[in-house]
Amino acid sequence: MAGVLLATASCVTEPPRNVNNACAIFAEYRDWFTHSNAASRRWNVPLPVLLAIMHQESAFRADAKPSRRWYLGFIPGPRPSSASGYSQALDGTWERYRIATGNRGADRDEFADAVDFMGWYIDQTARQNRIARHDAYNQYLAYHEGQDGFAKGSYRSKTWLMERAHRVRQQAERYRSQLTRCYPQAVTTL
């Protein structure tokens, strides 16, 4: 049994060594550029925005999940949500994506599926909430709070979340600057 667990654990892709540099990420995982660029073009979402939100949500960890609450220091409680994988998509939202796109076999721990989901969600947010696809700050707020929560302004009482959204915007700007050096075609096409 332990051997099966070890074999399964070794199948998870490790996060990039330098998650703060888009060029380093794509040098380490070349297929991630292909998948990210495809999602960017398919959903008309700037690649730096996709990367910055994924950086914040999971730090590019395939097996990311929200932290549990612990009781008495050793009894694990439930997780606060069903968020999982690179995109931290909730079960219901992930299922909506799978149905809407016909990608019924999509997995949240597969980078290609997760980045495509994020493009789809940002596209939906742009349509529903009228947030520009390149507006990393407001797109992140809507990503975190949900499209309905954003519309109701649920983020306004959460200064910590607005600060986090500001960091996402800054990270998107850094990624954009980096990508102009290593993949200029990825930032000039949108």
Q: What is the predicted function of each stretch?
A:
Residues 7-10:
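C-terminal motif of bacterial Sec signal peptides marking the signal peptidase cleavage site
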Residues 1-2:
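Sec-dependent signal peptide recognition
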Residues 12-190:
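Catalytic glycan-binding domains that act on GlcNAc-containing polysaccharides
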